[in-house]
Structures are given as C-alpha cells and as structure tokens.
Amino acid sequence: MSIGREEEVEIHNPPRFMPGERVCATRHIKNDGTYPGKEIGERLVRKGDAGFVRDVGTFLQQFYIYAVEWIDRGIVVGMRTRELRSLGGTSTPKTTECARGVNEGKAR
C-alpha cells in the first residue's frame, strides 16, 4: 500500500518565480506564528499587494517558498507558489493591475 501525497512535489520542476521578479498576492496571508513581532492571525499581506521575489528556498523537500519583499508594507514574507502570480515586466504596481486575475480560476 502506498501513501499518496496531497499535492505534487514542486521541486521536481524549476521555480515558477525568480529573484527580482514582480509578483502579486492572490490571497490574504495571516501570521501563522512564524513571523516574529506580529500577533498570530494578524494580516501580513493583502490580496492584490505587489512585491518582489528576493530569494527562493524549499520546504519539506516538496514546495518552493519565495521570500517576497512587500515594499508598501516594509516586510519580507515567505509565500507558496499558489499564493502568487507574476506581474511580469510592469514598471509600477497598481491596485487594479494586481487585482486583475486574482479571482479568475485557480492561483498559479
């Protein structure tokens, strides 16, 4: 009997986002207790916020974790692939630009 995984192993493929890439949050992110100086449950990132990928790491030898700098908030938060979408080469973040596509099907 084999044990199935709930989600595919992301690290078998290259990362979807690279350092320096502009990204947008596809959902609200709250502190799960791993972000220092903030209360558990406190909102760290809002859906539609724009930021830049600073680094790419892995978690549980299964998922990519992207260290994203949220310029407007002045914080860096670890994000999963499904919580982000690329803003490509756009020069300045706009709320409407970030929000576009957030509720259109599944997050990347």
From Swiss-Prot:
Keywords: Nitrogen fixation, Plasmid. Residues 86-108 are annotated as: Disordered. The keyword NAD does not apply. InterPro entries: Nitrogenase_MoFe_mat_NifZ (IPR007415). Pfam families: NifZ. The keyword Amino-acid biosynthesis does not apply. This is Putative NifZ protein. It comes from Sinorhizobium fredii (strain NBRC 101917 / NGR234).
